[in-house]
């Protein structure tokens, strides 16, 4: 049975499943759908075509599904889809998609979005990610699974961050980050590998292989793209080569890499 505060304002067109808790002074619009076990603390606002998955918990003064902050948006149909078991903390803002993007913003399962996180239109966030306080994502950003982003970090539109990456706090990131890398700075560049996350997800032999692979990729000569092509040709059946090198070759913004930065950090870790 759902538990709904008397002061909540809920559209009769909204869909509320069983076991949902809605706190005082929440506002829920026409196109909102809340799956089983969703919990809204007081003063949460949900608008637009917004779907919230099972057991997701949203804290006070979060605003989800309101009109994108994009001057090109003209009221077209778009969605915000959030998966299961997410924690969305105080004052987060998450916008739906736009006609100029994929028409939806997507967030996976088991993520933690800390206070004051902003997720702009057409972003795609995987599962098991942590976005610390004050992280700001511009539009059209793609984030893979198991990514950690430190507080007060700003990320440029259309940037892609692959699986298992770590973005240090107070960074400004304008380029793509391939799998399992750590980046830091303004502008942020790759400093080394996210070995903590790799040890959680991979076997030791695979970590060693990826370490050597990045050493080959990040040599001064040939270029990063040429190195990625060569690796794919020579190790086409290796899943890590395919994952990492394909990501590099598909990058439209370029990779956040400087040879001097990566080399110095890796030497410290070794």
Curated annotation (Swiss-Prot):
This is Acyl-[acyl-carrier-protein]--UDP-N-acetylglucosamine O-acyltransferase. It comes from the Bacteria. Its EC number is 2.3.1.129. The gene is lpxA. Gene3D superfamilies: Hexapeptide repeat proteins, Udp N-acetylglucosamine O-acyltransferase, C-terminal domain. InterPro entries: Acetyltransf_C, Acetyltransf_C_sf, Hexapep, Lipid_A_LpxA, Trimer_LpxA-like_sf. PROSITE patterns: HEXAPEP_TRANSFERASES (PS00101). Pfam families: Acetyltransf_11, Hexapep. Its main location: cytoplasm. Keywords: Acyltransferase, Cytoplasm, Lipid A biosynthesis, Lipid biosynthesis, Lipid metabolism, Repeat, Transferase. Homotrimer. HAMAP family: LpxA (MF_00387). One of its GO terms (molecular function) is acyl-[acyl-carrier-protein]-UDP-N-acetylglucosamine O-acyltransferase activity. GO terms for cellular component: cytoplasm; membrane. Pathway: Glycolipid biosynthesis; lipid IV(A) biosynthesis; lipid IV(A) from (3R)-3-hydroxytetradecanoyl-[acyl-carrier-protein] and UDP-N-acetyl-alpha-D-glucosamine: step 1/6. Belongs to the transferase hexapeptide repeat family. LpxA subfamily. Involved in the biosynthesis of lipid A, a phosphorylated glycolipid that anchors the lipopolysaccharide to the outer membrane of the cell. GO terms for biological process: lipid A biosynthetic process. It is found in: Cytoplasm. It catalyses: a (3R)-hydroxyacyl-[ACP] + UDP-N-acetyl-alpha-D-glucosamine = a UDP-3-O-[(3R)-3-hydroxyacyl]-N-acetyl-alpha-D-glucosamine + holo-[ACP].
């Amino acid at each position: 049975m759902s538990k709904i505060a008397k002061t909540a304002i809920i559209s009769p067109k909204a869909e509320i499943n069983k076991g949902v808790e809605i706190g005082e002074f929440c506002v829920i619009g026409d196109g909102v759908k809340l799956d089983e076990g969703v919990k809204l603390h007081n003063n949460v606002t949900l608008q637009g075509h917004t779907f919230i998955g099972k057991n997701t918990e949203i804290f006070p003064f979060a605003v989800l599904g309101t009109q994108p902050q994009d001057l090109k948006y003209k009221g077209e149909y778009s969605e915000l889809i959030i998966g299961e078991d997410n924690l969305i903390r105080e004052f987060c803002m998450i916008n739906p998609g736009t006609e100029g993007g994929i028409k939806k913003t997507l967030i996976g399962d088991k993520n933690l979005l800390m206070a004051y996180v902003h997720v702009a239109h057409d972003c795609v966030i995987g599962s098991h990610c942590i976005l610390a306080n004050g992280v700001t994502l511009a539009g059209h950003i793609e984030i893979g699974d198991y990514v950690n982003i430190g507080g007060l970090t700003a990320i440029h539109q259309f940037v892609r961050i692959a699986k298992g990456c770590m973005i240090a706090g107070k960074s400004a990131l304008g380029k793509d980050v391939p799998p399992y890398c750590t980046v830091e700075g303004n502008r942020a560049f790759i400093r080394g590998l996210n070995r903590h996350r790799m040890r959680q997800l991979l076997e030791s032999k695979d970590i060693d292989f990826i370490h050597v692979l990045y050493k080959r990729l990040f040599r001064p000569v040939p270029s990063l793209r040429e190195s990625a092509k060569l690796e794919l040709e020579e190790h086409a059946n290796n899943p890590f080569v395919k994952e990492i090198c394909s990501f590099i070759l598909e990058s439209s913004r370029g990779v956040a890499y400087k040879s001097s930065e990566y080399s110095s950090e890796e030497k410290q870790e070794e």
